[in-house]
């Protein structure tokens, strides 16, 4: 997801619970990438989704539980401290005389405009003023994001007139269209498009081969949710007008009929009136059922002898029938060749780009998946010739767009997108990458994408810049990859007074610059600093044209990263022009050693990194030290005596480790870029380093170190015993003795957190009289008492005037887990109090971070006084995860309260079922070389696994893949993607590492899982990968007992108890009773749910759901084997009156008939053999109804008959043979006898007669269908002659015969009723019956019914409904599955 911030949207809360549950934005808002915040003028509307602790799909939002607010309001998000001096633009960094008073800070028109696109803070403006030709010229930046709009303001040309955008690529595959189908044009220049539409190609288009490749796509699959919403609204308005017009006509027709016939007694007139009424009712009903799935666009691809060309037919998007025609389209080719783009229609105003891959077999239509990417690109490089103050940081740089935010997933990044983007960046020889996306990670500096980036940085000298995250203000909240990867420059978000006053339009700006409140902080869990540098984290920058505005305000580390990236482009522009060697190692060192520190305390570096970057100083540094080796100093830290784990810094935060001296081994390994000369660079490398500690009283280091190419180790002693409570930050760094002015060559962060212990009983800790102003943060560290599992907190505020908004975070770091974080963003009036409940991990240090939002309270002179009290509670159990093994035995659970007396109220509920599936097919293939060849030259392979499952009823299902889910950066697997489709190939769900539930109707489904990697052995191991299909079920509440036999005897029910401190108490958890288990559950399935034990101290209600209680734990039950079915043949000794020879003859006959049914009829030869066997069997078993029914079934299975009229006549004759073979009188007499059978023979006879009835009815039904189709094929009209009239009488005669045996309006036979009404020109009645049939279909959609509906609508002339149904046909019955 990307890294943008959270907003308060029209007062709608975005709430996130303690366990990181899903959160949503209000319908008036748009979810933004995790690093950015949208402006008040255009809010993106999207579902915000949790990814572990703070993840939204494709786009990162800062937090949940926080009231998201438009960034331009006075309550805009931001926080921490940082500022920049200079000319009234940036604001001061830290304190001092330079800080102008708030009262004296004023903007004029020019400084206001400049504040919208901040550059002064990082001194980019003065650098360009001093070096106008070093404005990014000669530098190419790859923007890894949601894609950007090449037509957006400022993204057309560079400052020196070159094309701004070099390429636009969809790396996700979300815009891919299968164009492998080849067609030829007829003599009129017509071709059939993939949608079935007839298209006219332009005669002037060059196509030497005459081959046209066709494909199609629903256009909403290319649009963002917000654009789709806008287009739907406009289309609905137009559709409603047309529908209302047709309703008026239908009502008038009914009125005219009633005026002519005051009394309707004649049966025929009654039917006529019913038909007119049905039309009115049908049209009204359509308005309620309307659901716009979007127009279909047809795509045509051809080779003009030089390049691949693309044209689209977008008539379905246009109101004007003469607009959007294929022949009028100006053909495009791959963007990088001609740099041209198209616009779908005037309605959407959405720009797109076309790229052709795989020799024309794949067309990629590239659109952005959110405005985020365009905004990011604008901050980095926009050029506005008419207003230079609105320029991006590097207006002379060129860019390529690498879309990693998948449109199918709401702009979530995918492994496929990330890998392809890196391949594209290297193919284009990009100098820089900006990536404003990220996720929480289990392990820092780990994973496949991290490995690929590190390889590119080392081998190709690629400089990779990324956002640090928006999960602050707590420490250890940096996200992957930006804040956790050594080879990536991670950027925090800073706001200056000028930005606050101008871009955010606050009433009164802060007196000095500061870090936004939500900007993520370090260190990483392995001790690395996390944030490298800071840069302005907000801007009013360009957005796509489909937003119907030129620019908007967004803020987040998503905005800070391109600001820094653009600044680095200025440095590279100068370095290239002046011949200074370019290396990510030297550039990073220059940035870190020249940044302006923000704040006065050492631990401020955990917030801002080395400080606010300064372009001019970094440039001077690079010039001065250009002759020194380009070396990266890799740091490996181990606790003495231990080889694992290896970390990149020293991070002490748990009680024991923080209260004793420890010795650490530091290994420093210089790393050169690949290709460095052994003799000229590696062997001569030798540096005499002076080692320093920022506080020798705490961190002691050797004085000197001689470092050579093979590296060197040294020891460090850390003594925290004299430190007070709180966070303490130190650094160990190495200085070149011969050139100390170079500054630190490497730094080793040392973070020590000394927690408070909670000694009193009951365990309560309080923090009194804390004083807050805007942006102020108070951090408290508490050693969570052993035995605590949750905490109840109260925050009291007073002493202020206007309302105050706060961020409250708690965070704990546990081994091999993502940081455990709880967060809330309450608003307080004065005085007021609020209570909170959050889970805790026993014995682990917990950070409590309380921050007054950076813009909250600006303009007020009154500080906020806060009292915060935490009371710890806990019910500990001997097993946190419970597994019931499927037997009848209960599980014993021991509970204990170590802190104080607690209520023990266990509640156990199973509410989901997980069914395991193995793949029925595994296809491994090599992908095309165009997009999927790595830097190493290795070709990526794809493994497609196919699974089948069936739902007996509609249900919400979610795929669950334990090996792969919930990890995108911190995994060695490259990519995963799944889609779920029905037997019609309609796709119901798509997903990746974070699967979500999807509502599916009853039916059979296919899940295809797509995995990518270049390692064939790894993919081979996954060919039998187990996938679980999880679905909701009715709650099963498990019983609790105080004795082991309780589940059987029903005695000793356990309800509740009071746990005394230190006294254990046990109870038994019984398995569910067999009658409560879901029916037809396969063996190996699991029922899953939650169990809770404790209860809130202030809650007197009886909780019925474990999730209502403070802490819940997973519980699962293995479904036991089903009861074996009895052998019915063995159980009942059959009494048969037939002789052995008669039974043998019967078995032979039935076997022959079965064999006939299994014969294929695909070729003429096979059909001839089938007919011969039919003739032979009919002569052998004359008038045997099951045989004749099987022959009729065989005829119906042939769908490719050449002469359709002859085929239907053959069906009629076969049906007649079935009808003639049945003694209808005997059958009628038997069915009228309702006596229940009393023996086996009578039961068999009853079943036989019922089968015969069904065969008779089916024959009559198929005969009627065939007769109707013959009439349709011949184009007969009512009253065309005696022969036709006689044929109609035969149809009616057949229909009336069918009504004697079955309900002709039932789902099985209703189609014939529809055709009958159609023949009688009662089209409204026909539609009513057909619509009822479709509504009653509770399984996979029947294509023939929808085709019949389309025919009826076309015959009536309701063109708006015809168009609507044709679009739905593309959804329900696509010709093939979409590409991955």
Swiss-Prot record:
Cystine pairs: none
UniProt keyword list: Aminopeptidase, Coiled coil, Hydrolase, Protease, Serine protease, Stress response
A GO biological process held by the record: proteolysis
Up-regulation conditions: By cadmium (at protein level).
Signal peptide from the UniProt entry: none
Skewed-composition ranges (Low complexity): 1110-1120
Mutant phenotype after disruption: No visible phenotype under normal growth conditions.
A Pfam cross-reference name: TPPII
Residues forming the catalytic site: 145, 372, 558
GO cellular component, one term: vacuole
Regulation: Inhibited by alanine-alanine-phenylalanine-chloromethylketone, butabindide and phenylmethanesulfonyl fluoride (PMSF), but not by leupeptin, N-ethylmaleimide, EDTA, MG132 and lactacystin.
The reaction(s) this protein catalyses: Release of an N-terminal tripeptide from a polypeptide
GO MF: aminopeptidase activity; mRNA binding; salicylic acid binding; serine-type endopeptidase activity; tripeptidyl-peptidase activity
EC identifiers of the protein: 3.4.14.10
Coiled-coil region list: 1152-1181, 1238-1300
Region (Disordered): 1099-1143
Function of the protein: Serine protease of the proteasome pathway that may function with the 20S proteasome to degrade oxidized proteins generated by environmental stress.
Family per similarity comment: Belongs to the peptidase S8 family.
Assembly and interaction partners: Assembles into a large oligomeric complex containing two related proteins 153 and 142 kDa that are derived from the single TPP2 gene. The 142 kDa form mainly differs from the 153 kDa form by a truncation at the C-terminal end.
Protein name: Tripeptidyl-peptidase 2
Biological classification of the source: Eukaryota, Viridiplantae, Streptophyta, Embryophyta, Tracheophyta
The encoding gene: TPP2
């Amino acid at each position: 997801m990307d890294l943008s911030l959270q907003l308060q949207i029209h007062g709608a809360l975005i709430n996130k619970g303690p366990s990181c549950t899903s959160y949503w934005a209000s319908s008036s808002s748009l979810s933004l990438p995790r690093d950015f915040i949208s402006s008040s003028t255009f809010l993106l509307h999207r579902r915000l989704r949790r990814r572990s602790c703070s993840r939204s799909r494709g786009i990162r939002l800062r937090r949940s539980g926080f009231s998201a607010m438009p960034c331009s309001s006075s309550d805009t998000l931001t926080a921490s401290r940082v500022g920049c001096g200079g000319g009234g633009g940036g604001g001061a960094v830290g304190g001092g005389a330079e800080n102008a008073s708030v009262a004296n800070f004023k903007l004029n028109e020019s400084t206001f405009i400049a504040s919208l696109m901040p550059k002064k803070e990082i001194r980019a403006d003065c650098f360009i003023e001093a070096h106008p030709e070093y404005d990014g010229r000669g530098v190419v930046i790859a923007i890894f994001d949601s894609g950007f709009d090449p037509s957006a303001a400022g993204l057309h040309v560079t400052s020196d007139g070159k094309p701004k955008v070099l390429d636009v690529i969809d790396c996700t595959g979300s815009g891919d269209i299968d164009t492998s189908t080849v067609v030829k044009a007829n003599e009129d220049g017509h071709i059939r498009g993939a949608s079935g539409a007839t298209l006219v190609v332009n005669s002037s288009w060059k196509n030497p081969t005459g081959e046209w490749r066709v494909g199609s796509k629903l256009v909403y699959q290319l649009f963002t949710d917000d654009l789709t919403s806008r287009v739907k609204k406009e289309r609905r308005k137009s559709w409603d007008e047309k529908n209302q017009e047709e309703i008026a006509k239908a009502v008038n027709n009914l009125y005219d009929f009633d005026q002519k016939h005051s009394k309707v007694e004649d049966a025929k007139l009654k039917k006529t009136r019913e038909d007119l009424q049905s039309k009115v009712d049908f049209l009204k009903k359509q308005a309620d059922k309307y659901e716009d799935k979007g127009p279909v666009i047809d795509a045509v691809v051809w080779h003009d002898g030089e390049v691949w060309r693309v044209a689209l037919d977008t008539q379905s998007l246009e109101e004007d029938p003469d607009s959007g025609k294929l022949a009028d389209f100006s053909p495009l080719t791959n963007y990088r060749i001609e740099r041209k783009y198209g616009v779908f229609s005037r309605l959407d105003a959405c720009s797109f780009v076309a790229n052709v891959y795989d020799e024309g077999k794949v067309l990629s239509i590239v659109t952005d998946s959110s405005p985020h990417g365009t905004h990011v690109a604008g901050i980095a490089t926009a050029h506005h010739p008419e207003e230079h103050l609105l320029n991006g940081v590097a207006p002379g740089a060129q860019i390529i767009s690498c879309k990693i935010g998948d449109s199918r997933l709401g702009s979530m990044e995918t492994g496929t997108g990330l890998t392809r983007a890196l391949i594209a960046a290297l193919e284009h020889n990009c100098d820089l990458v900006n990536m404003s996306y990220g996720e929480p990670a289990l392990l820092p500096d780990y994973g496949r994408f991290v490995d690929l980036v590190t390889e590119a940085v080392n081998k190709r000298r690629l400089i990779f810049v990324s956002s640090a995250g928006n999960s602050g203000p707590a420490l250890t909240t940096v996200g992957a990859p930006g804040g956790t990867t050594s080879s990536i420059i991670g950027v925090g978000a800073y706001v200056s007074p000028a930005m606050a006053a101008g871009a955010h339009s606050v009433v009164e700006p802060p007196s000095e610059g500061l870090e936004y409140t939500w900007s993520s902080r370090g260190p990483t869990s392995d001790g690395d600093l996390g944030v490298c540098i800071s840069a302005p984290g907000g801007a009013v920058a360009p957005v796509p044209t489909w937003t119907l505005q030129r620019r908007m305000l967004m803020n987040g580390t998503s905005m800070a990263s391109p600001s820094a990236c653009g600044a680095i482009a200025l440095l590279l522009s100068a370095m290239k022009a002046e011949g200074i060697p370019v290396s990510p190692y030297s550039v990073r060192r220059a940035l870190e050693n020249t940044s302006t520190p923000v704040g006065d305390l050492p631990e401020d570096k955990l917030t801002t990194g080395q400080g606010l970057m300064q372009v001019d100083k970094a440039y001077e540094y690079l010039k001065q030290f250009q002759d020194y080796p380009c070396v990266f100093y890799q740091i490996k830290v181990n606790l003495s005596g231990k080889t694992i784990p290896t970390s990149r810094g020293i991070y002490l935060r748990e009680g024991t480790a923080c209260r004793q001296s420890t010795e650490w081994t530091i290994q420093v390994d210089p790393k050169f870029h690949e290709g460095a000369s052994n003799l000229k660079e590696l062997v001569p490398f030798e540096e005499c380093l002076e080692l320093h500690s920022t506080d020798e009283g705490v961190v002691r280091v050797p004085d000197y170190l001689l470092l050579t190419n093979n590296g060197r180790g040294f020891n460090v002693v850390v003594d925290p015993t004299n430190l007070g409570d709180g966070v303490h930050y130190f650094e160990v760094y190495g200085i070149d003795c011969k050139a100390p002015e170079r500054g630190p060559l490497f730094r080793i962060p040392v973070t020590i957190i000394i927690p408070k212990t909670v000694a009193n009983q009951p365990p309560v800790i309080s923090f009194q009289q804390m004083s807050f102003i805007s942006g102020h943060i108070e951090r408290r560290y508490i050693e969570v008492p052993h035995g605590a599992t949750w905490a109840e907190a109260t925050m009291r505020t007073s002493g202020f005037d206007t309302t105050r908004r706060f961020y409250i975070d708690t965070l704990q770091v546990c081994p091999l887990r993502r940081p455990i974080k709880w967060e809330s963003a309450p608003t307080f009036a004065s005085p007021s109090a609020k209570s909170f409940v959050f889970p805790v991990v026993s014995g682990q240090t917990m950070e409590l971070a309380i921050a007054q939002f950076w813009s909250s309270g600006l303009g007020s002179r009154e500080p906020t006084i806060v009292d915060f009290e935490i009371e710890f509670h806990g019910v500990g159990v001997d097993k946190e995860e419970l597994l019931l093994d499927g037997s009848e035995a209960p599980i014993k659970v021991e509970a204990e309260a170590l802190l104080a007396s607690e209520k023990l109220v266990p509640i156990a509920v199973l509410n989901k079922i997980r069914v395991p599936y193995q793949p029925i097919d595994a296809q491994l293939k090599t992908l095309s070389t165009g997009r999927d060849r790595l830097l190493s030259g290795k070709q990526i392979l794809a493994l497609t696994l196919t699974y089948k499952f069936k739902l007996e009823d509609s249900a919400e299902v979610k795929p669950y893949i334990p090996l792969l889910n919930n990890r995108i950066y911190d995994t060695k697997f490259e990519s995963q993607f799944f889609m779920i489709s029905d037997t019609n190939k309609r796709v119901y769900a798509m997903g990746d590492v974070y699967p979500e539930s999807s509502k599916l109707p009853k039916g059979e489904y296919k899940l295809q899982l797509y995995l990518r990697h270049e390692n064939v052995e790894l993919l081979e191991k996954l060919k039998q990968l187990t996938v679980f299909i999880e679905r909701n079920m009715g709650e099963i509440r498990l019983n609790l007992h105080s004795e082991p036999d309780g589940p059987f005897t029903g005695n000793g029910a356990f309800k509740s108890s009071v746990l005394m401190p230190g006294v254990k108490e046990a109870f038994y958890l019984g398995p569910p009773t067999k009658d409560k288990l879901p029916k037809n559950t396969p063996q190996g399935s699991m029922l899953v749910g939650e169990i809770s034990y404790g209860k809130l101290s202030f809650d007197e209600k009886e909780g019925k759901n474990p999730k209502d209680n403070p802490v819940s734990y997973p519980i699962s039950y293995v479904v036991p084997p089903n009861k074996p079915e009895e052998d019915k043949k063995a159980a009942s000794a059959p009494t048969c009156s037939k002789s052995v020879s008669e039974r043998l003859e019967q078995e032979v006959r039935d076997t022959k008939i079965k064999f006939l049914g299994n014969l294929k009829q695909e070729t003429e030869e096979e059909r001839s053999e089938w007919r011969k066997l039919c003739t032979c069997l009919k002569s052998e078993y004359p008038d045997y109804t099951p045989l004749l029914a099987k022959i009729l079934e065989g005829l119906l299975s042939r769908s490719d008959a050449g002469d359709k009229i002859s085929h239907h006549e053959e069906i009629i004759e076969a049906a007649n043979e079935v009808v003639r073979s049945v003694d209808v009188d005997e059958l009628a007499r038997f069915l009228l006898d309702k006596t229940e059978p009393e023996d086996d023979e009578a039961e068999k006879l009853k079943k036989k007669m019922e089968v015969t009835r069904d065969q008779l009815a089916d024959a009559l039904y198929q005969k009627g269908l065939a007769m109707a189709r013959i009439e349709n094929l011949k184009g007969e009209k009512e009253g065309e002659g005696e022969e036709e009239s006689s044929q109609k009488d035969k149809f009616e005669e057949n229909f009336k015969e069918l009504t004697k045996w079955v309900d002709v309006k039932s789902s099985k036979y209703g189609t014939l009723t529809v055709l009958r009404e159609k023949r009688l020109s009662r089209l409204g009645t026909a539609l009513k019956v057909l619509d009822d049939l479709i509504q009653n279909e509770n399984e996979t959609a029947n294509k023939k019914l929808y085709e019949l509906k389309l025919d009826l609508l076309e015959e009536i002339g309701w063109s708006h409904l015809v168009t609507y149904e044709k679009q739905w046909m593309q959804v329900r019955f696509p010709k093939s599955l979409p590409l991955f």
